[in-house]
């Protein structure tokens, strides 16, 4: 904006592009857009530019609700694998970009599915299948959020023995008390 002598704000889908503090007058309030911090554990930081419009939500997030009655796996493209183990009746609500495909499968067949369809049916990807890391949470009885840094989160409700999450090696996962 400074180079073209304009005071109009521009937007970018690329994270971390705000270079200076920008004051924005909105009705009777003054808002400040400030440079942010780049988080290396955010998958958004490691997504190729051509995938950003697929990963970043363009509309308000709409929850995608699944009722699960047996051990199941939720695959978010080839970016995230969520294994729900030892569940009888569990609700899984996904809050991610509408452009990322969510695939539900039986957990005992998840390994075979990922080996056979990774980077094809399970896409997009940002790392090889061998470059995945594992996060675990044991004993869920109630509501729990599984946050995938930079992408969104799953809200798990019910009782299950274990949650196992696989993400690319640069990503991170946080388990927290459900916020919704």
Label the predicted regions:
Residues 2-180:
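Helix-rich effector regions associated with P-loop NTPase G domains
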């Amino acid at each position: 904006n400074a180079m073209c002598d304009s005071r109009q704000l521009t937007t970018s889908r690329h994270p971390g592009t705000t270079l200076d503090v920008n004051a924005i007058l909105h009705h009777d309030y003054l808002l400040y857009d400030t440079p942010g911090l780049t988080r290396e554990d955010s998958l958004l930081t490691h997504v190729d530019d051509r995938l950003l419009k697929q990963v970043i939500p363009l509309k308000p997030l709409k929850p995608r609700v699944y009722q699960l009655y047996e051990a199941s796996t939720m695959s978010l493209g080839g970016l995230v694998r969520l294994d729900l183990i030892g569940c009888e009746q569990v609700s899984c609500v996904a809050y991610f970009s509408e452009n990322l495909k969510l695939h539900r499968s039986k957990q005992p067949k998840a390994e075979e599915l990922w080996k056979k369809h990774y980077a094809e049916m399970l896409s997009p990807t940002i790392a090889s299948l061998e470059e995945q890391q594992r996060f675990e949470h044991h004993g869920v009885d109630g509501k729990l959020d599984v946050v995938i840094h930079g992408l969104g989160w799953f809200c798990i409700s019910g009782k299950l023995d274990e949650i196992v999450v696989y993400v690319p090696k640069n990503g991170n996962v946080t388990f927290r008390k459900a916020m919704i």
